[in-house]
From Swiss-Prot:
Residues holding Zn(2+): D45, D49, H153, D157
Keywords: Cell inner membrane, Cell membrane, Ion transport, Iron, Iron transport, Membrane, Metal-binding, Transmembrane, Transmembrane helix, Transport, Zinc, Zinc transport
Membrane topology of the entry: Multi-pass membrane protein
InterPro entries cross-referenced by the UniProt entry: Cation_efflux, Cation_efflux_CTD, Cation_efflux_CTD_sf, Cation_efflux_FieF, Cation_efflux_TMD_sf, CDF_Transporter
NCBIfam families recorded: CDF, PRK09509.1
Protein name: Cation-efflux pump FieF
Keyword Transmembrane set for record: yes
Subunit structure: Homodimer.
Source organism (scientific name): Pectobacterium atrosepticum (strain SCRI 1043 / ATCC BAA-672)
Family named by the database record: Belongs to the cation diffusion facilitator (CDF) transporter (TC 2.A.4) family. FieF subfamily.
GO molecular function, one term: zinc efflux antiporter activity
GO cellular component, one term: plasma membrane
Name of the gene encoding the protein in the UniProt record: fieF
TM regions (residue ranges): 11-31, 40-60, 81-101, 114-134, 156-176, 182-202
Its job: Divalent metal cation transporter which exports Zn(2+), Cd(2+) and possibly Fe(2+). May be involved in zinc and iron detoxification by efflux.
Length: 300
C-alpha cells in the first residue's frame, strides 16, 4: 500500500470526524436558542455526519491493510461498503427531514433569536467549505471512493447550510413558512444525493469496469506495443486504490518463450508506470491458438 495514499485518506477521515463533532455541538446550541426546524434538520444531519465519518474512518483504516492469505486481492472493497453504509445513513436522515419539513409547513412556528442561528450557520458554512476543498484535493490525488463519498456528503451540507442561512433571514423578516419549506427542499436534495452515492458504491462492488478514458488509455498502450500481433479480452476493475487490469496478448507462434515473456513484462511495466500500483495479469497466446473472430479485437 502506498504510504502517501494511506496518510492522505486517513487525514481526510479524521478531519471530517473532527469537523462534524464541533459543528454538532454548535448546532445543538443554536437550535436550543431558536427552535428552528431547518436548524434541527442541520443538527440531525450533523449527527449522521459523525456516525458516517466514524464508520468511514474505521473502514478506511481496515481497507489500508495489505493483502493477506485470506484476502489475496487486498481489502479495498471495504471502501465501497463504507460508501454504501453512508448512503443508507444519509437516506434515513433525509426522510426524517422531509417528514419534519412537511409537519412544520402545515403548522409554522415563530423563531426565537434567529440571529444566533445565522451566526452558527455561517461558521458551519465556512468550516464545511474548507473541509470539502481539502477532501476534493485528497480525492484528486488518491481516487479514494470512501473519501469521495464523504466529500459528496459534505457538499450537500454546503447547500444545506446556505439554504438554512436564507431561511433564517426570511423567518427573521416574518416569512414563517420559509424555515420549514427550506428544510423540506434540503431533505429532498440530500435523499437524491444519497441514492446516487449508493448506486455508485453498488456498481463498484459489482466490479464495474474502469472509466472509459482510462480504458482507452490502457488500450492505446497495448495496441501500439511492438512485438505483438494483437490483443483481446481486456478486463478492468477497481478495488479501493488498486486498479486491476487483465488481458490476452497474441504472439507469433515462432517467438521464443523467453522473448514473449520479456515483451509482456515490458508492457506490464509500461502500464504500471501510467497507472501506479495497478495489479496486472497478461496472458500470452500463440496467435494460431486464438479463434479468428477474436484476434485483434482490442482497439484504441
Amino acid at each position: 500500500m502506498n504510504p502517501h495514499y494511506a496518510r492522505l485518506v486517513t487525514l481526510a477521515a479524521v478531519s471530517a470526524t473532527a469537523v462534524a463533532l464541533v459543528l454538532f455541538v454548535m448546532k445543538v446550541f443554536a437550535w436550543w436558542h431558536t427552535g428552528s426546524v431547518s436548524l434541527l434538520a442541520s443538527l440531525v444531519d450533523s449527527l449522521v455526519d459523525i456516525a458516517a465519518s466514524l464508520v468511514n474512518l474505521l473502514v478506511v483504516r481496515y481497507s489500508l491493510q495489505p493483502a493477506d492469505t485470506e484476502h489475496a486481492f487486498g481489502h479495498g472493497k471495504a471502501e465501497s461498503l463504507a460508501a454504501l453504509a453512508q448512503s443508507m445513513f444519509i437516506s434515513g436522515s433525509a426522510l426524517f427531514l422531509i417528514l419534519t419539513g412537511l409537519q412544520h409547513s402545515l403548522e409554522p412556528q415563530t423563531l426565537h433569536a434567529p440571529e444566533v442561528g445565522m451566526w452558527v450557520t455561517l461558521i458551519a458554512l465556512v468550516a464545511t467549505l474548507l473541509l470539502v476543498s481539502f477532501q476534493r484535493w485528497v480525492v484528486k490525488h488518491t481516487h479514494s471512493q470512501a473519501v469521495r463519498a464523504d466529500m459528496l456528503h459534505y457538499q450537500s451540507d454546503l447547500l444545506m447550510n446556505g439554504a438554512i442561512l436564507v431561511a433564517l433571514a426570511l423567518s427573521w423578516k416574518g416569512i414563517t413558512r420559509a424555515d420549514s419549506l427550506f428544510a423540506l427542499g434540503i431533505g429532498v436534495y440530500i435523499l437524491y444525493s444519497a441514492l446516487r452515492m449508493g448506486y455508485d458504491a453498488v456498481q463498484s462492488l459489482l466490479d464495474r469496469a474502469l472509466p472509459d478514458e482510462e480504458h482507452r488509455a490502457i488500450a492505446e498502450v497495448i495496441v501500439n506495443w511492438p512485438g505483438i500481433r494483437g490483443a483481446h479480452a481486456l478486463r478492468t476493475r477497481r478495488s479501493g486504490p488498486t486498479r486491476f487490469i487483465q488481458l490476452h496478448l497474441e504472439m507469433d507462434d515462432a517467438l521464443p518463450l523467453a522473448e514473449a515473456h520479456q515483451i509482456a513484462d515490458d508492457l506490464e511495466q509500461a502500464l504500471r508506470k501510467q497507472f501506479p500500483g495497478a495489479d496486472i495479469i497478461i496472458h500470452q497466446d500463440p496467435v494460431s491458438a486464438v479463434p479468428e473472430n477474436q484476434r485483434g479485437r482490442l482497439t484504441a
